[in-house]
Amino acid sequence: MGKKQIMIPPIIVGIATLSGFVIMHFFPAPSPIEVCLRSHNDTFNVHSRIDLEIDGQKKLMSDNVGKSKDGRECLRVIHTDKIGDQVHVQFVRPVRLTLDDFMKIYSADNSTIQVVDNSTGSNLYQNITLADYNVDYSYFSEDRFVKISNLTSSPPLSDTFLAKITLVSK
């Protein structure tokens, strides 16, 4: 074999690798929170708790959080499986998602959230306009709730994660 024949395979591999890096740089994969899941049985599953409190009253998340995107049916990476305080993080691989990512799904329009009031024994769905409230976020750590000043710096959602979203009327 000549030198040219020996050099051809490494050159082809080098060009293919460089092409892959260029494609990934200019066309990155979408953020996990933008993805619609194909099924409800992916390998990475985390269940976190998020307590909602509005003017001192405990509220629950509805069972349709993370079930649609842009008005069409879509199972999002962060969603609720039933009415309550538990969110389900599900993906094909381990992923680090925070309370900020949850709020991008829970309040897609960044102005309203839907809550459930079951204080009377029956579920009453309410749409809450966030602009009417002072909103505080915190997470439970070392026997107390720690205020989150910047949602992007919150700890990742995990099976032991407990957050509190407190809304107080302005």
Where in this protein do the model-derived segments appear?
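Ubiquitin-like/PB1-type beta-grasp interaction modules and other compact soluble beta-rich domains
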Residues: G2-K170
